Amino acid sequence: MPKVALTTGGADALECLVRKLGIDASEVTNPEGNGHFNFFAGHDGANRYGSDLNAGVSFPAASKLWGSLDTLKPYDLVLLSCEGAEYPEEKGDAAFKAMAAYTALGGRMFASHWHQVWLKSGPFPTIARYTGQADLGDQTAEVVTTFPKGKALSEWLVNVGGSVRAGELSITNAQHTIVEENPLYAQSWIRTSSPEGVQYLSANTPMGAPPDMQCGRVVLSDLHVAGGATTAGGTDSSSPSFAYPSGCVTSGLSPQEKVLAFMLFDISACTIPDSEVPAPPIVK
């Protein structure tokens, strides 16, 4: 199992997906514990465990994770949950440089809505054109099938009940901060046409390096996980008011969560150009 750092945020509840993917509670700890999933408190997000989990201790601040390359290095994958805005003042130049160095060394970063700030403010090349327009509301988006893994995502979503028709995804509360990807570096996976927007894109790192020199990866999402996970019992929430996992009230995977599950497996896999067909792992 990869070692994963997850930062919470007050505008989504990415941490609730961990439970739905079947990760045992014993695997969720603070960094000094033995768990493979370590939580960090982002802006207005959940910041402590419930009394029956890790003795109710507080999460370290997200700045303790992204503040330096040394604190990022222990992790194979960093998951950044939406904070509701970019909040660059809570990150800073040292953090932007550290995250870029982390991905260049082979680290994987999943950047949820508003975490495009890492790619806009850090020493990355321009991988997308951004916008500050209003959210899109509910949308039927296109799953891009012009590359092998996009086609696989489309087929998989139909198989697991995430899509009714191949090549389409119904999105609840679609966001609109990405207009289009820069094809020199990035591949779009899910997009809207009216208005034009990208809901998922990926890029291998170091960006611009030859493929055989790229071992890291970033995924940028404009989807909220909790926005698609609503039941009669409410919506999953992340807030200092909810000790984890009390803010996680839904069960089962929404279509948006199923997409994220696919993307998490992809971002954790061996890095290959998105234009190539993934090969089965070598069994020794």
Question: Language-model segments: what does each one mean?
Answer:
Residues 1-9:
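Short hydrophobic beta-strand segments
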Residues 1, 70-74, 102-105, 195, ...:
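Extracellular/periplasmic catalytic domains that process cell-envelope and extracellular macromolecules
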Residues 25-31, 168-169, 272-280:
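Surface-exposed patches in mature extracellular/periplasmic domains of secreted proteins
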Residues 84-183, 193:
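A glycine-rich, often tryptophan-bearing local segment used as a flexible ligand/cofactor-contacting loop or short
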Residues 12, 93-100, 104, 151, ...:
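A structural signal for well-ordered alpha-helical segments within the folded catalytic domains
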Residues 49-73, 79-81, 86-94, 162-208:
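A Trp-anchored, charged/polar loop motif used as the substrate-binding/catalytic surface
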Residues 11, 112, 118-143, 196-199, ...:
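Extracellular ligand-binding/catalytic regions of CAZymes and related secreted enzymes
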Residues 11-125:
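Helical hinge/lid and interdomain linker segments adjacent to catalytic or ligand-binding clefts
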